[in-house]
A protein has these predicted regions:
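Conserved ABC ATPase signature
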Residues: 121-125, 129-131
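Conserved ABC transporter NBD signature motif
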Residues: 48-56
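Helix-to-loop junction immediately C-terminal to a conserved catalytic motif
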Residues: 40
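A short, proline-enriched helix->beta-strand linker immediately N-terminal to the Walker B motif
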Residues: 140-144
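Catalytic Walker B motif of ABC-type/P-loop ATPase nucleotide-binding domains
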Residues: 146-149
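ABC ATPase NBD coupling module
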Residues: 57-74, 170
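Conserved ABC ATPase "signature" region
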Residues: 56, 100-117
Length: 211
């Protein structure tokens, strides 16, 4: 991934297996969120490829990448990106505009322990409750790939551990890749990647390899 100062983050031959959960650990600025954005098709690498289900996202137009992300990828953003003045149900049902079937919403909210909040405005929720709503919105699509950027960043360890457990348990066979700063959560995942070792910075270079 290239930056305006000519530097680059390089990820070489990273491969993620189906139906596995991955924790991405590493210091701030080591490229964890950048990797998620590459996998989501939000960013494009300066060189190399990003292949998901046999499709190279770098060969798709931005519109095609957006369509692929809507259909195949669930992204849980660090800042949630929920509409505060709308209810929990309305935030999830907005996905209908993108062709997503949300008929399983009640069952999913029940599994996440927030069905009672279905008709409550998001602005009235706690940080942990908003986190679960963001998870529900991502999982309602039954995505093949689930990306989570610091899904426990605003929570204490005990609450964060419960959220991670719920995320993994409700992934419904999808591959989960989650950024976390808390090494204590690592044992919850099938595999752990130390991004300080996986990614490297090059001054004046360009991104190489395949994700």
């Amino acid at each position: 991934m290239d930056f305006s100062d000519g530097s680059a983050i390089c990820y070489e031959d990273l491969r993620f297996e189906d139906r596995q959960s991955y924790a991405l650990l590493g210091a701030s600025g080591c490229g964890k969120t950048t990797l998620l954005n590459l996998l989501a098709g939000i960013l494009t690498p300066g060189a190399g490829s990003v292949e998901i289900d046999g499709r190279d996202l770098t060969r798709l137009s931005q519109r095609e990448r957006d369509a692929f992300r809507i259909k195949r990828i669930g992204y849980i953003f660090q800042d949630f990106k929920l509409l505060e003045e709308m209810t929990v149900a309305d935030n999830i049902n907005l996905l209908r505009l993108e062709g997503v079937d949300t008929s399983g919403m009640d069952a999913l909210l029940e599994r996440l322990g927030i069905l009672r909040l279905k008709n409550r405005r998001v602005r009235r929720l706690s940080g942990g409750e908003k986190q679960r709503v963001a998870i529900a919105r991502a999982l309602i699509k039954r995505p093949a790939l689930i990306l989570a950027d610091e899904p426990t960043g605003n929570l204490n360890f005990e609450t964060g551990e419960r959220v991670v457990a719920q995320l993994i348990e409700n992934a419904d066979g999808g591959t989960l890749i989650a950024v976390t700063h808390d090494e204590r959560l690592a044992p919850r995942f099938d595999r752990v990647l130390d991004m300080n070792a996986v990614a490297r910075f090059e001054a004046g270079g360009e991104a190489k390899g395949r994700v």
